[in-house]
Amino acid sequence: MLEVKDLHSFYGAAHVLHGASLQVAPGEVVALLGRNGMGKTTLIRSIMGLTPPTVKQGDVIWKGETITRMKPHDIANKKIAIVPQGRRLFSSLTVTEHLTMFKSARATEGWTIDRIFSTFTRLGERRHHRGNQLSGGERGMLAVARALMQDPELILMDEPSEGLAPVMVQHLEGVIAELGRTGLGILLVEQNLYSALAVSSRVYIMETGKVVHSATSEELAKDEGAVQRWLGVHG
């Protein structure tokens, strides 16, 4: 289980996280919602040990071990993977070469390239295409697939559906839901309320650097008006 306890993170002198706390259990898909600038990406980066920001108070605990302030490489070796914003790819490498590069040296089973291509059928069709030949949706799928090749037990996804066409969003939602059923824990940063409710079992809502509400997706689905007010969504 991932436990984040009272985390305070800073960008220089700017206090960005103000005591954020949450949990992700094995096989649980947890959505982290909030408007831009509320600290969602900062929280993801703090969990993964990426700098900036700088964590000055609080703890990140993974499977009973405190990993706060560990180096990102050491955290990745704990079988935690990240799908960051930006979807940066190597323009000269093919889809297959990207996956081979990210294959975990520790893994003896789990995610293979064949399994990736059966899960992400579009990537299979484009396996020989280079990074600069992929659409935005295909790049997003490849970013998720690369993380899976590390054979993680927990994956942190920072707005993986951003900029995707509706058909690609629907496909990604199906993949995320299926991953949760395999026992993979997922912390999913989202701004799309409906995507979050479609795949998650629990939702945390962030505002000004802290978690201000937590509920099951079923509970929030019954109180959509309240969620829209919290997120500043109208209409």
Feature names for model-found ranges:
Residues 1-235:
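Glycine-rich phosphate-binding loops of nucleotide-dependent enzymes
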